[in-house]
């Protein structure tokens, strides 16, 4: 029909009525006048799964959009959004027929049309048809009837992204069931986007510190920083500020929105501290985001300013010691992803624990910023354990190990102004690398410590944008910059530009109302308990959960007592967690530190405390008190060497096999490293990603609270491809416990079926087979059970028939893959099953 212009069906009917082929009503004329023009081909689109031996699929077509254009013909039956494909008839949805002047034109037109089709809710054979159209044998016109049998590459099918449907399903779930992250918490009243500063996106990008690093290399760059008169500023808003104030809950979407503004309006910043610490696992565990994607996207938006992370030495970005080869691999992958400055620290200032991580950083060509964690009080003559000499010796040792910059990590805000002045002045005389001062404003006075340090040539200081500063976060960046204007240490940062960026953060913070920590007043009690800023609000939240909020002063006192019991140690993740766990444990059980040493009492200490005292986190100066070791570790031999030395090297190949199982593709090195760091967290994240796709681009109000009817937003899923999502309404609950959530997607009606967890379904969902369990026999296709050939207790042999399924006029026999015994049969003849339903259990 397409190449001759003759309506064959109509002509057949007319011939059947008795007309001769030459009849004028047929319009065929003489045979010689019938000519063919061009080429035509037909693709039959069916609900068959080519990845599962073309097993038919059935169900509801959630969305249907067809192709069109010149030379395109569609012959469809029940192909439309909402159509139900049942298992009792043919699986064909639509016949796509195209024509072109050349065979190659017809192929290209067919491919274009197949790619334009959007069919969601049921599997189709479109991926297979595209493989055929792309194959050289087909393009050359040399196919035979054995083509498919002899060409297994046709079944190397691309994974369909299906991004819009997955995102709508996630949004529907939040609308119907809420987001567990914010349940029971305060609701944010802000829905509109935070305002962005004005800048010219087409203007040349100003030069920044990263440009200077690439020009000079890390060693010369370090000297260049030291030679500058200005005080460099690192902005911690992207990481430590929200880690301290909002439990690390800021999302990539909000960080990315403001990133380019930083590159254009604040190029004189030393760095953006935006990765590492708790962000790595929190992004996957709670925000369902890929931490590597956050790094890559911010790097793309900010190519001119240094990006900085916090690296917990042999703990990497975790809470335990990892094998040395995992630490090295993580550092390399991070540097390759675009990270410039690694702030390396050990929770006990134990130099041997820092060496592997520092060496790994030095090998990458990135900046190694080695840290000394500040504790005690160097101006208090009664506190002699951590005196000035102690810190000077540490600094010299780190410089000798190759550090490019020395960080003073004052994680609790203990370094008083005069102490900062003395420490920095002395270190400047003793070492030859720049000094970077990090502190928390828990005591409310730490801006003075920075300014006192600036008087004696402090090189770099950490601060946070005004709305994200103060309390357990860092000092106020905006006022710091203003206070140094018109002095010889002025920062070079533009105050008005910073104020525009500040307005963005002020509004963005309103999105995170559910995570606002209780504002605890700044008190001098900090100098007694020495609790790190990143722990202070978290421990208070834990105390609240245990019903100890009204005993907070007691918790702080016991925390200080626990520190002294353990020998007065450096307290930062993970050692601070162990001290906090012990303090809460004692207060909750109405015990004191005296009870810890009372051998007549049987105490089950928290695991973190046992690990700390047992040496799994390293060794403090002078070690732990012997009586504490004996009481807490008991019969277990404590570790005195570096924990990483006793850990066997991680088997990357074996880990890759495990990752491949749940990713269902070959994993990258980066994915294997992530799995080795957080196996369960990463596996759960991948499962969420498979179900809902990339949710990091959803605006924060809708991610946490869902949309209200009529609310609309746009999200870019790739360059040049934007989804405009409008929520309409939710249906009443269905008998199976689902609700239908109705949307408009790019102006077209779409819906998502979501389980309402508050409803009791009339019929329980069927048990699903564990496809990794050889004892589970699952359905390979949706259909009806025609016959069951076994019963519980039967001894079966390999190849024996177990049952028969039927769908769309096709019967499939399920045979045993090995000798076994039937334990349980979950189906019966006449029962409808879905793909993956558990049918038979073996042993």
Describe each model-derived feature in a short phrase.
Residues 1-183:
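ATP-dependent carboxylate activation and anion-phosphoryl transfer catalytic cores
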Residues 25-37, 152, 210, 215-218, ...:
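Long, charged amphipathic helices and adjacent flexible linkers at domain junctions
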Residues 252-272, 287-306, 316-433, 451-458:
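Alpha/beta enzyme core
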């Amino acid at each position: 029909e397409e190449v001759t212009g003759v309506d064959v069906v109509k002509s057949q009917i007319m011939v059947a009525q008795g007309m001769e082929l030459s009849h004028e009503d047929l319009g065929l004329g003489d045979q010689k006048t019938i000519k063919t023009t061009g080429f035509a081909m037909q693709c039959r689109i069916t609900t068959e799964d080519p990845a599962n031996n073309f097993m038919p699929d059935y169900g509801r077509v959630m969305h249907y959009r067809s192709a069109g254009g010149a030379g395109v013909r569609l012959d469809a039956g029940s192909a439309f959004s909402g159509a139900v494909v049942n298992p009792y008839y043919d699986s064909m949805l639509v016949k796509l027929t195209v024509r072109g002047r050349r065979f190659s034109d017809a192929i290209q037109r067919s491919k274009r049309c197949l790619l334009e089709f959007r069919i969601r809710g049921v599997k189709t054979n479109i991926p297979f048809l595209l493989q055929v159209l792309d194959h050289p044998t087909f393009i050359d016109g040399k196919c035979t009837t054995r083509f498919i049998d002899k060409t297994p590459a046709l079944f190397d099918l691309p994974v369909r992204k299906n991004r819009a449907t997955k995102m709508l399903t996630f949004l529907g779930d939040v609308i119907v069931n809420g987001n567990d992250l914010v349940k029971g918490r305060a609701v944010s009243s802000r829905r509109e986007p935070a305002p962005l500063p004005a800048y010219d996106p087409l203007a040349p990008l100003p030069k920044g510190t990263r440009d200077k690093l690439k020009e000079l290399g890390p060693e010369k760059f370090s000297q260049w920083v030291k030679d500058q008169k200005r005080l460099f500023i690192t902005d911690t808003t992207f990481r430590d500020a929200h880690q301290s104030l909002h439990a690390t809950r800021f999302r990539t979407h909000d960080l990315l929105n403001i990133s380019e503004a930083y590159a254009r309006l604040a190029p004189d910043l030393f760095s953006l501290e935006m990765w590492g610490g708790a962000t790595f696992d929190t992004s996957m565990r709670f925000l369902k985001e890929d931490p590597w994607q956050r790094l890559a996207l911010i790097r793309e938006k900010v190519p001119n300013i240094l990006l900085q992370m916090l690296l917990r030495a042999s703990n990497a970005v975790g809470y335990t010691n990892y094998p040395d080869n995992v630490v090295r691999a993580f550092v390399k992958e991070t540097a390759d992803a675009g990270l410039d400055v690694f702030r390396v620290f050990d929770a006990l200032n134990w130099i041997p624990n820092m060496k592997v991580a520092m060496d790994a950083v030095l090998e990458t060509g990135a900046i190694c910023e080695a840290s000394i964690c500040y504790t005690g009080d160097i101006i208090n003559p009664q506190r002699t354990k951590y005196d000035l000499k102690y810190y000077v010796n540490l600094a010299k040792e780190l410089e000798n190990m190759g550090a490019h910059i020395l960080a003073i990590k004052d994680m609790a805000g203990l370094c008083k102004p005069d102490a900062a002045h003395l420490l920095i002045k002395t270190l400047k005389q003793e070492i030859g690398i720049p000094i970077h001062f990090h502190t928390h404003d828990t005591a409310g006075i730490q801006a003075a410590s920075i300014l006192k340090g600036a008087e004696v040539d402090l090189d770099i200081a950490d601060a946070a944008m005004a709305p994200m500063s103060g309390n357990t976060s860092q000092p106020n960046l905006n006022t710091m910059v203003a206070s140094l204007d018109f002095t010889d240490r002025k920062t070079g940062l533009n105050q008005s530009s910073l104020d525009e960026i500040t307005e963005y953060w002020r509004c963005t913070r309103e999105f995170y109302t559910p995570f606002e920590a209780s504002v605890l007043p700044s008190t001098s009690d900090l100098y007694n308990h020495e609790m790190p800023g990143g722990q202070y609000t978290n421990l208070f939240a834990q105390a609240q959960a245990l019903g100890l909020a009204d005993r907070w002063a007691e918790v702080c006192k016991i925390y200080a007592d626990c520190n002294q019991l353990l020998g007065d140690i450096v307290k930062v993740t993970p050692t601070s967690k162990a001290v906090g766990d012990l303090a809460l444990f004692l207060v909750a059980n109405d015990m004191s530190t005296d009870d810890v040493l009372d051998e007549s009492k049987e105490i089950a200490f928290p695991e973190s405390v046992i690990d700390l005292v047992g040496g799994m986190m390293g060794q403090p100066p002078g070690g732990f008190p012997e009586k504490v070791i004996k009481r807490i570790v008991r019969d277990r031999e404590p570790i005195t060497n570096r924990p990483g030395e006793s850990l066997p090297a991680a088997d990357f190949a074996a880990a890759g096999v495990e990752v491949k199982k749940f990713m269902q593709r070959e994993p990258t090195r980066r994915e294997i490293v992530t799995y080795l760091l957080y196996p369960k967290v990463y596996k759960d994240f991948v499962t969420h990603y498979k179900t809902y796709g990339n949710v990091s681009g959803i605006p924060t109000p809708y991610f946490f609270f869902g949309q209200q009817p009529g609310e609309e937003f746009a999200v870019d899923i790739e360059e040049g491809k934007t989804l405009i999502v409008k929520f309409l309404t939710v249906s009443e609950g269905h008998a199976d416990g689902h609700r239908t959530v109705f949307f408009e997607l790019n102006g077209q009606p779409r819906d998502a079926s979501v389980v309402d967890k508050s409803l009791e379904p009339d019929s329980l969902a069927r048990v699903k087979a564990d496809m990794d369990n050889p004892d589970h026999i699952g359905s390979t296709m949706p259909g009806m059970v025609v016959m069951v050939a076994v019963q519980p207790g039967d001894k079966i042999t390999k190849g024996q028939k177990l049952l028969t399924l039927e769908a769309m006029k096709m019967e499939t026999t399920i045979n045993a893959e090995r000798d076994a015994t039937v334990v349980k049969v979950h189906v019966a003849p006449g029962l409808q099953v879905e793909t993956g339903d558990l049918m038979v259990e073996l042993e």
